[in-house]
């Protein structure tokens, strides 16, 4: 009888440890929709520079105004999975665009967009920001210029998986 209890206990602990291991691999707690906390999240807590490029936009590619002459587009796992499935971006999706000058070396700005459920339903629930290369906040929040330009696209996204 003790053997049955021991086997049951070992099985329970194994399932418990596997479940906790899976939980640890999930995205870190999502950031607030405010400039400073979001910057900390994408540069320290869950650095976007370790993320993959958005599908079809690997490496540097030509850009246009108001962004840089050349761009790099990073996306978190949530955004990449939705893009590959052909779905709209879900809550927690983050895209980070590095904006470069004509020489392809001078980083001019970092312009992320973050889907935060309930943040701005009229603006697709996107939080927008523009940071200087040093992380200084140039604009953030419900940015009219971003919303006006992007609203003509499905889910406010110009970048579609290729």
List each model region and its residues.
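Positively charged n-region of N-terminal signal peptides that target proteins for export
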Residues: 1-4
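Bacterial N-terminal signal peptides
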Residues: 8-18
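Sec/Tat signal peptide C-region and signal peptidase I cleavage site
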Residues: 20-24
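Sequence context surrounding c-type heme c attachment/ligation sites in exported
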Residues: 25-50, 54-61, 67, 80-162
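Sequence-specific dsDNA recognition surfaces
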Residues: 67, 71-77
């Amino acid at each position: 009888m003790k053997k049955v209890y021991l086997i049951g206990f070992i099985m329970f602990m194994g399932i418990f440890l596997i479940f906790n291991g899976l939980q640890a691999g999930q995205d870190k707690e999502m950031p607030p929709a405010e400039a400073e906390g979001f910057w900390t999240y994408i540069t320290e807590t869950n650095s976007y520079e370790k993320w993959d490029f958005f599908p079809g936009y690997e490496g540097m590619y030509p850009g246009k105004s108001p962004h840089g002459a050349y761009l790099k587009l990073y996306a978190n796992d949530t955004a990449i999975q939705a893009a590959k499935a052909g779905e709209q971006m879900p809550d927690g999706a983050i895209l980070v665009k590095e904006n470069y000058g004509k020489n392809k070396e001078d980083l001019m700005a970092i312009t992320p967009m973050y889907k935060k459920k309930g943040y701005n339903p009229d603006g697709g629930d996107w939080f927008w920001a523009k940071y200087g290369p040093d992380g200084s906040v140039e604009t953030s929040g419900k940015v009219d210029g971003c919303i006006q330009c992007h609203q003509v696209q499905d889910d406010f996204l110009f970048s579609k998986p290729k």
